[in-house]
Amino acid sequence: MKIAVFCSANKNIDPDFFTLTEEMGKWMAENGHDLVFGGCNSGLMDCIGKAVKANGGRTIGVVPTLVERGGRTFPDLDIEIPCDNLSDRKDLMLTQSDIFVALPGGVGTLDEIFTIAAAHTIGYHHKMVILYNMKGFWNSTIALLDDMAEKSMIRGDWRDVIEVAENLEELAKLCKG
């Protein structure tokens, strides 16, 4: 399975996020899952790429030209897919991936989550987004989605499009379908 991972490129975050991300990368490689990611050499993106490669897995980086020109490309990509901008990157990641996992991240990660989820709700695809809720990172986002649903701003149950995994075991089960 090709698992797209959305996550932070920031280095200055809770060290536990790096530890949990390494565990996920190891699990992905050991279970034959390919990593599809933004292909950056920083933060959790770098961490997941290194963990997958260190355990014999395959990395597919969808790299915007701005990242490439800035010398911020993950150095050990098996496949590099160049793209013009972040919108192209999301579109290419959608076509390249079977499922999406969101690790802790910022505005870019939120953009990726909601772009994929919105496309699902409209019917462009039927791929799931999983919020890997490391240390409760996504709790406020989950509360926001619940509040929006309560106010009838979301049709149906948002959990039909976005699922939540509290730990690696739950994540593994959700990835198996």
Where are these regions (language model features)?
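A cross-family phosphate/adenosyl-ligand binding-site feature
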Residues: 1-96, 132-176
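Short, structured loop/turn "capping" segments at alpha-beta junctions
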Residues: 59, 124-127
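Active-site/ligand-binding-proximal alpha/beta "capping" segment
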Residues: 88-123, 130
